């Protein structure tokens, strides 16, 4: 939606599943699409040539504020709703056998963001980042017990 006029615009995007159990959320196109036009692009996918997710850091990413930007304030987590989206996408693909799709029992405890730059608030909007989301899953129906977990998401925007 364009804030100044309140008009809504349609955007063309693409989301796909690379393999069973591995969801790749990709937006090849994130530009305004005019009605009746078909946009065809073949953007380079440098991000996927880099391999799988990096090894989990040896040190606790939620405690090392020299290497990671840590978000543990409730208001900052709410202001960055993309974190919740990343978490829900991660949980949704982790167990395909469940019939319980209620993700309201997830509580984000802390988020650590690693970028190539020194940690700062700008890490929240970094185009290239690895995001570690520590959360508690209260859904006993899905997991059998309350679990303290960490979701790892790599983001690459070009």
Curated annotation (Swiss-Prot):
InterPro entries: MS5 (IPR006462). Coiled coil: none annotated. It comes from the Eukaryota. Pfam families: protein_MS5. Belongs to the UPF0725 (EMB2204) family. PANTHER family: CYSTATIN DOMAIN PROTEIN, CYSTATIN/MONELLIN SUPERFAMILY PROTEIN. This is UPF0725 protein At3g57210. The lineage of its organism: Eukaryota, Viridiplantae, Streptophyta, Embryophyta, Tracheophyta.
